[in-house]
Amino acid sequence: MSRPIAHDYPFDPTYGYDLDALLAIPAPPAPDDFDPPWQRLHDRAREVNVAPEVGSQEADHDGVRVFGVGYTSLDGVRLGGWLVLPDGPIDRGLVIGHGYAGREAPDLPLPVPHAATIFPCARGLNTRGRVPGIPDDTDRHVLHGIGSRDGYVLRGCVADLWCAATALLELVPSIGPRLGYVGASFGGGIGALALPWDNRFVAAHLTVPSFGHHPLRLTMPCTGSGESVRRYHAAHPEVIDVLRHFDAATAAARITIPVQVAAALFDPAVPPPGQFAVYNALHGPRDLVVLATGHVEDAESVVEQQTLLAAQRRFLTAHLNRW
């Protein structure tokens, strides 16, 4: 689980927390009006005519076919991604988010077999989510519209997941409303924000989820998107009033479906206290995979990743098979 890690970061990517301390971090206090705006946003997103369009087949990979896909999200934003359909029977659906770098292709193989899967690109991000007026680099994207709750870009990114789910269900109606969600880093945090309000999702896996416990994150230097937010907050401390409404740990306390979280003890990009705050806040059935490192690529992390994928497959298969 833990191992000595040599590094040259100008800060300690454990932030002084061991596993016991990480498991004791609660979610921050929620704003009194946290729930209603999310519920209203979800209602609006579910009313969107997503008008999904499937392009030509782009690849054939180990028993699955890959197609380009486009759909409309909240506020008329047209987004792209990939639709992956397995050969043979299809009995479940997956929505798979991405990290803050966006994505250039779907992540294959799929986490579970027999799953029709949509890989959406969030608004503003590479390569099929670019939107005029929204920066596509991480440092500026995470600050876009941060001055107000209704204008913050993460609000739209959450709606993009809901609309992607609608698109998938329209394209493959046989799977019914029994979806799984998988997301890492940015996708883990956005997933945590999306899951409490949408009963079409029945199980989820979140790896090193971002946006957890903003009051703590704002005290911790990092190499990820949180650093831009931390520096912005130093000059504009009032932004905490917006960030409290986009706290993945606060949202996680409202999730009731089974969720597996993979959280790291050492992570220079997403501070581990925020990751564990998301897991600790979960009230439904939950499973924890403790990673030695997050956002680190070395020989040990490659092996650890294979162990994680096996755990993810077992968890999702078990819980999606119940529906």
Which residues fall in each region the model found?
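N-terminal targeting or regulatory segments adjacent to alpha/beta-hydrolase or S9 domains
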Residues: M1-G63
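Cap/lid segment of the alpha/beta-hydrolase catalytic domain
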Residues: A105, A116-A159, L218
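Gly/Ser-rich "nucleophile elbow"/oxyanion-hole loop immediately N-terminal to the catalytic nucleophile
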Residues: V142-S185
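Hydrolase active-site cap/lid region
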Residues: G191-H236, V290
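Acidic catalytic loop of the alpha/beta-hydrolase fold
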Residues: L265-V270
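Short beta-strand/loop motif that positions the catalytic acidic residue
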Residues: R254-T256, V261-A263
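Short beta-strand element of the alpha/beta-hydrolase
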Residues: G81-L85, I90-A101
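C-terminal catalytic histidine-bearing segment of alpha/beta-hydrolase fold enzymes
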Residues: R3, F276-W323
